[in-house]
Every structure is written in structure tokens, then in C-alpha cells.
Amino acid sequence: MFRRILIPFLLLASLVGAAAPAQAKDQHSLRILLTNDDGYSSSSTQSLRQALIAAGHQVTIVAPLTDASAVGTGLNIKFGSTLEAVERSPGIWSIAGSPGDAVAFGVRVLFASNPPDLVISGPNAGENVAALINHSGTVGAAVTALAGGVPAVAFSTARGPSNSFPSTQQSIDFAVKVVNKLAATSAYNGKILPDHTALNVNYPVTPNGQVKFAKLGTSLPVSTDYAPAPDVCATCYRILPLPATGPDPVTDADRTLLDAGNVTITALDGSWEAGPAVTTLVKVRLTNLTP
């Protein structure tokens, strides 16, 4: 049997400002909320859960009911509406919403009395690098966790030829290594990561044996193009992929290093604020404006 819960979204909105995460009793055994944007039944997420449990961690899946890719940091704030949450089997929950909704529900309801030590999102089927993370539900779920004071790691596996993912199992094994390393080296007042910090980890198609700490690129590995689709309707357009044609302009960008076969790790803080130099330049140009 599974359990259904209908939760008003007013409760989920209180995620921001949630309590800081508590440590598990065993410092090397973490209480983990595992999510994704591919749906709770994703085989790679189920495999990661089993691998983490085998490593001694406590893992609860709280993930979207169906595929919710490319929804970014979307969160349902239609206050007064409802969300359906179903416990499909012990420790595995489906949420009729976005990855962000799943994390918000998990932190505020399932872990209400004791927040998880870590939120893990993924492993996603497809890389999440450079400007692509702005649209990623996988990374969006990790950013939602930061808003509630819970550290997070997003894992993604690069796409190979013919839409294949030959390094999926390797990426799962590496994810467990990362989690175990974080659990064994906590140094931030007992927290897994510094406040307001998430990690974005991407695993290459053909690993070269190197792990690189990368900067966040600014390019889009793939964007969208549109072509008339009169076979569907007179005003319809078909959405097509538009691959990037040039290198990322950022030195040591995650996209560049991943394409070279490196595992990439990038620290994120969830902020879209421009740096001080850009802010100063814009301020000078817009000086003396009045309402």
C-alpha cells in the first residue's frame, strides 16, 4: 500500500528560512533526501539510492511523479492550491510537481523535525554545465535546498552518441565517493558544506581519470531553434536543438573540461547577482535616475 498526502502550498512556501541541517548520529552516515527531475521511478536514481544505502547512508527519495526536466528552479506558489504526495513504497515518495516542489515538501514535511544532512539531485541523464544550469531542474532542486538552509549536490551524466549514457554506472559510483568524502571530512561547524553552498558535479562520457574543479561557463551547450510545422497546424513551430558552435569564453569552464573527459565539480551559491565590477559600471551609466 502507498500513502497519499495532500498538502496546501502555503506550507511549502515556508521553506525559505528553514532550520539548519542536523547531523546524523553517526558522523559518517548521512540522512539524505534524494531527488531528480526525471521522475521518482528513474532507474539511475533508484540505483544511486541503493548504492548510498549500501554505503551506510539513510536515503529517502522525494521526486516528481513524472519527468520534469528543464523547469529550472520552478516552485508552485499558488497559495491555497494542493499538491499530491504519494509514498509509493517505504522511503520512496512521488510528488505531483517540480523538483523544487519535491525538495520543499521533503524538507518541510517528511524531515520537518530534523532536516536532512544533505539533498542530492540526480544523477541526471545529460550534462548540466555553463548557462544550461539556469534551466536545469536537477540543479534547480539543489538551489531550492539552499533556500532552506540544507546543503546540496547535483549530479549529472554526460550524453553520449545516439542519446546514450555509457558512463551512468561510473557516475553513480563516483557520486557515492563524493558523498562519503563529504561525510568523512565535515569541517563547517559540523555541516557537510559551507552555508548557502551546493556542488554541481558532471561526469563525462569517456572519463580520462581526472577530476577538475571548474568555473561555471557562460555558453549554452545546446539551445533551441524553431521551424514551421504546417503538418501540425498553420501557426505551429517545431522545437529543434541548436548545438553550440564555439568554445566557452570562460577559462577552465565546466563545459570545456567536461568535453575533454574530466569529471567537473563547481561550487554554486544560488545567486544570479553580477560581480562588483559590472554593478559599478551599470550604476555609473544609470546615475541620476529618479522614479
Residue ranges: model-predicted function:
Residues D38-S41, L65-S69, P99-D101, N124-V129, ...:
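Solvent-exposed loop/turn segments at secondary-structure junctions
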Residues S113-G160:
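Internal, conserved structured core segments that host functional sites
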Residues A20-A24:
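Sec/Tat signal peptide C-region and signal peptidase I cleavage site
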Residues H28, Q50-V107:
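A cross-family phosphate/adenosyl-ligand binding-site feature
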Residues Q170-P291:
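Electrostatically charged, flexible surface regions
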Residues P8-G17:
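Bacterial N-terminal signal peptides
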Residues M1-F9:
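Bacterial N-terminal signal peptides that target proteins for export
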Residues R31-T35, V59-A63, S94, D117-G122, ...:
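Structural recognition of the beta-strand scaffold that forms the well-ordered cores
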